[in-house]
């Protein structure tokens, strides 16, 4: 992918523009801009899922696919590997990045924790889109307890 600084700048501008266009939360308190960002990420994830794994299409298990996300996909997008992958062996995976590039530039402080979710929506869509292309239906959520670390929870939905 492109230079990390360009991607970070583009992402920051997308978030800022969508937030400026959608100042009030909709019904249920969820902003439509979060859905738009996740949709953008989903489409990018689909494209990357089609492009990246051609050499490694021997995924035998869900765990192999998640390892691919943590290593190959994360390196292609963020130029670093995911720090941790945990599972309960029942279809739930937790991916942890202790220095998530899209949150690194944010100041650490409790007031900024409220702003963090809007910077994670695109990446949730990215993960979900890549998994979708690889034939895995999933639900991806993100959480931040302390900046710049974040966790992505991937719940595999059995068909």
From Swiss-Prot:
Recorded GO CC terms: cis-Golgi network; endoplasmic reticulum; trans-Golgi network; TRAPP complex
Oligomeric form and interacting partners: Part of the multisubunit transport protein particle (TRAPP) complex. Heterodimer with TRAPPC3. The heterodimer TRAPPC3-TRAPPC6A interacts with TRAPPC2L. Interacts with TRAPPC2L.
Upper taxonomic lineage: Eukaryota, Metazoa, Chordata, Craniata, Vertebrata
UniProt keyword terms in alphabetical order: Endoplasmic reticulum, ER-Golgi transport, Golgi apparatus, Phosphoprotein, Transport
UniProt function note: May play a role in vesicular transport during the biogenesis of melanosomes.
Positions of modified residues (Phosphoserine): 33
Protein name, UniProt field: Trafficking protein particle complex subunit 6A
GO terms of biological process kind: endoplasmic reticulum to Golgi vesicle-mediated transport
